[in-house]
Amino acid sequence: MFRLITLKIQNFGQFLSNMIMPNISIFITWGIMNSLFLSLDWQYNKIFAQLISPIIFYLLPILIGYTGGSLIAGQRGGLLGSITTIGMITSTDMPMFLGGMVAGPLGGWIIKGFDQIIKNRIKSGFEMLVNNFSIAIIGIFLTIFSFFFIGPFIEGVSKFLGCLIKIIIDFNLLPLIAFIIEPAKVFFLNNAINHGIFSPLGIQEISENKSSLFFLIESNPGPGLGILIACFFFGKEKSYKSSGTAAIVQFLGGIHEIYFSYVLIKPILMISLILGSMTSIFMLVFFKGGLIAAVSPGSILSILAMTKKGLYFANLISIFSSFLISFLSAMLFFKINLGQKIKNDKSSIQLFKNNLFPIKKIGDEKYDFIKKIKNFQKIKNIIIACDAGMGSSAMGASILRKKIKSNNLTHIYVSNIAINLLPKNADLVITHEKLTYLAKKRAPDAQHISLTNFLDSNFYTSLVKQLDLNKDFFKKNNIQDKKDRITQINIDSHKEIQSKCFFQISDKNIFLNQYAENKKEAIKIVGKHLVAQGYVKKDYIDAMLDREKIASTWLGESVALPHGTIKSKDSILKTGVIFCQFPKGVHFGETIDDIAYLVIGIAAKNNEHIMVVSNITNALDDKDVISKLSKTKSVKEVLSYLNVNVKKN
């Protein structure tokens, strides 16, 4: 439930952010003009100053309304969102940014619903007439509605928030919002907070004060920088070695997400973030600091560019003090080694993390959750599903099938499949934790297991052990004939796959000593090789990147298996596998330790790749082999470990 609520909040926050982010350059344009041409600033110019007001009162709200509508219903939604926003703009005398964020999606939803109602009901030749007049007529009603109702309502909400903020500031309580901001940021809600909440509030305030501290509350790089520097100097784990580079990227590049995983590794550092943020806000209030416009990304360079003349000291002291407090408190936690008992006890630290951040992890020494599965005796059909059914699920199925066979559990059939093709009569479905929700909708009567590591051999061993304990049930119930039939199905399926296996991995499919800064770059490298060898069309690379956004293709054990979405099958020309070695590693998973040294790209037509994946899986079942494959400089050695003959092309 917690994961579902978090996902809903993230999706809503992302939607709000998506209305602001495409227009952030216009915000910056307005901010620079505001700084340059208004009185008491750098270069007052009475003529140019006339350009500023229309941007904040008309252009920006309409752009937000258009963007919000287009996110729902494309261009038609954007047009209706724009005209709806006009109604609110003319009904008030304040910038209608919040109004645009309401009017845009409202217009989009209404025109989307209208289009669905009239779909396939318009006579040929009348499409353009209906499309144009529908926007005009609906737009008139929405404009009037927004003028009389939505505009005044948003104005009232804005005034209420303004009074509330004034009370908070008057009572010196503003620093306390750090208790909300910093934990929310670590859950990747930073853009939602900055662009969905603080940017509209900041613009509301800037019309009176010429600058606003709300623009700097979330975007301040100080607290995160303090965490990263403390990790670099005092963190003992290997995962902290990269924090020095991360600090440069975060401070100069403004990519705050880079420090979130370091906090999740050691949750006590959340206190350091909160203390740093509280210090920053206190300094901003005390010295009356702030920015003239929203900044994105939250880089020190962007912040300096958006700083009004006369506020450099206030803003810089705010950033520095937040860095100092965050760094010193984090150093203290590292020095006194708070929670030493938890650190030394692996099971306790997992429990500690799960209590603070209840994300279900598979990979503990004990798999007690497997025992919660009911009616092991009735499990005859196990399906491992992923979004496309060609990569991670194929590897997982290969490992489980091998263990099922070695334990002579011939009554159980193991298969892998795309999640949208899940049959409703499945007995047991195994999926990545981010896809389990979809799997339960497709197969509500099946039992479900979530995991994060498809190569976790211990998990499959524990599952098979429980299945093995219940195998006598079949003997007692005289269903040997069914066992024989299922066994024959397994044999026939295996022979069919072998007979159709036209693809064989060779030296042209192996690429050693590759380098990538991040997983996006690594996926592009793999995809480029798939395209170059004629396996896929060029748009398959975009499909691979889209697939990575759904859930990470990190398998565990230093291996990633990127592939396209189920919708991208038409972009596959023929089955192909690309094996790329990244000796320096690429961060692929959700935690800082999820580093892939082997990235295997797959494009599959039908089941032609299954035998190749099976061979790869057998090799990757041995950690020593994975280590050697990660370091070897010989293509022949790679092929030998993959149990195939060297075949030159």
Swiss-Prot record:
CDD domains: PTS_IIA_fru, PTS_IIB_mannitol
InterPro entries: PTrfase/Anion_transptr, PTS_EIIA_type-2_dom, PTS_EIIB-like_sf, PTS_EIIB_2, PTS_EIIB_2/3, PTS_EIIB_mannitol, PTS_EIIC, PTS_EIIC_2
Superkingdom per UniProt: Bacteria
The protein's Enzyme Commission number: 2.7.1.197
GO BP term, pick one: phosphoenolpyruvate-dependent sugar phosphotransferase system
Top enzyme class: transferase
Membrane topology note: Multi-pass membrane protein
Post-translational modifications: An intramolecular phosphotransfer takes places between His-563 and Cys-386.
Catalytic activity: D-mannitol(out) + N(pros)-phospho-L-histidyl-[protein] = D-mannitol 1-phosphate(in) + L-histidyl-[protein]
Modified residues (Phosphohistidine): H563
Record-marked site positions (Stabilizes the transition state in the phosphoryl transfer from HPr to EIIA): R547
PTM-bearing positions, type Phosphocysteine: C386
GO cellular component: plasma membrane
Example GO molecular function: kinase activity
Domain notes for this protein: The EIIC type-2 domain forms the PTS system translocation channel and contains the specific substrate-binding site. The PTS EIIB type-2 domain is phosphorylated by phospho-EIIA on a cysteinyl residue. Then, it transfers the phosphoryl group to the sugar substrate concomitantly with the sugar uptake processed by the PTS EIIC type-2 domain.
Function noted in UniProt: The phosphoenolpyruvate-dependent sugar phosphotransferase system (sugar PTS), a major carbohydrate active transport system, catalyzes the phosphorylation of incoming sugar substrates concomitantly with their translocation across the cell membrane. This system is involved in D-mannitol transport.
Subunit structure, interactors included: Homodimer.
Protein name: PTS system mannitol-specific EIICBA component
Encoding gene per record: mtlA
